[in-house]
A protein has these predicted regions:
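Extracytoplasmic thiol/disulfide redox context detector
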Residues: 2-115, 232-262
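C-terminal cap of thioredoxin/glutaredoxin-like
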Residues: 5-7, 13, 160-262
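Hydrophobic/aromatic residues in well-formed alpha-helices
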Residues: 20, 153-154, 168
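Solvent-exposed, acidic/flexible segments
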Residues: 68-69, 73, 79-87, 110-117, ...
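Loop/turn elements at helix/coil->beta-strand transitions in domains of secreted/extracellular proteins
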Residues: 70, 99-102, 127-132, 164-165, ...
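Second-shell loop/turn segments in exported
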Residues: 76-79, 106-110, 122-123, 139-145, ...
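Sec/Tat-exported extracytoplasmic proteins
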Residues: 79, 90, 94-97, 124-128, ...
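Structural microenvironment flanking redox-active thiols in thiol-disulfide oxidoreductases
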Residues: 96-126, 132-159
């Protein structure tokens, strides 16, 4: 199923831009869930998720740089209301994992117009301001209704947060940040991201509130978030077990099943 992510051409007023953005957000945020709506999942539950229902396995596992830890990656977009809503629950979940995981975020860009917010994220990261600013950026966009979609608007905003405007702009336009944008695009393609928020675990498994929602049906967003975290817990246990099996040299269940079919 294809989704039209093109913002309609309209008179360039703030009202029209916001209306167009809302339409785009709806398509981006729910793209994955709609894609899974026709998957049979009669026996799937968040506590016992099924591949192709509450989560999916990538055709090609991606390399991670987390060492012995399990890498957990959130793909997100600052202007996505579902990313904003999911963030507090995700942050709490990450804290509970302690040293078991290596957590990172990847800001996505489905269009060139998304790139200013990608640059915002990576500039804050480079300046060591991300932990303090992540929630503030979400709040500015979704609560204060600020349009942080241009370099000027973003620079003005960070300046109000006590960050040196000139230094920020220099980092925002730096080669280092540009390199991060290229890497983000590669990851977005590798993980086949067509909706956010989405969480990848150990470079192999992905899930999201919209994927889980395609199985559970119409539920309050808080229920979908909680269910997604349950699936993530299950995937963490699965990845941990598979790593232990691999380290001992014992064949994984998938390998045994594949061998039995030959």
């Amino acid at each position: 199923m294809q989704f039209d992510l093109t913002i309609p051409a309209t008179t360039p007023t703030r009202h029209n831009r916001r209306n167009a953005l809302r339409k785009l957000v709806a398509g981006v945020s729910f793209g994955l869930g709609l894609g899974f709506a026709m998957v049979p999942a009669a026996h799937a539950t968040p506590a016992a998720p099924v591949n192709g229902a509450e989560y999916r396995t990538l055709d090609k596992a991606q390399s991670t740089d987390a060492g012995k830890k399990i890498e957990v990656t959130e793909f997100f977009w600052y202007s996505c209301p579902h990313c904003h809503a999911f963030d507090p629950a995700l942050v709490n979940w990450v804290k509970k994992q302690g040293e078991n995981i290596s957590f990172k975020r990847v800001p996505v860009a489905f269009r060139e117009s998304f790139q200013p917010q990608q640059r915002l994220y990576y500039a804050l990261e480079a300046m060591g301001k991300l932990d303090d600013m992540q929630t503030k950026v979400f709040h500015a966009i979704h609560v204060e209704r600020k349009s942080l979609d241009t370099e000027a608007a973003i620079a003005d905003f960070v300046a109000t947060q006590g960050i040196d405007r000139k230094k920020f702009v220099d980092v925002y336009n730096s080669f280092g940040v540009q390199s991060k944008l290229k890497r983000a695009a590669q990851l977005q393609e590798a993980y086949k991201i067509d909706g956010v928020p989405l969480v990848a675990i150990d470079g192999r498994y992905v899930t999201s509130p919209s994927i889980v929602g395609a199985t559970l049906g119409s539920q309050p967003e808080a229920v979908l978030q909680t269910s997604t975290l349950q699936v993530m817990d299950w995937l963490m246990a699965k990845a941990t077990k598979e790593r232990k099996t691999a380290s001992t040299g014992a064949p994984a269940a998938s390998q045994i099943a594949a061998a039995s079919k030959k």
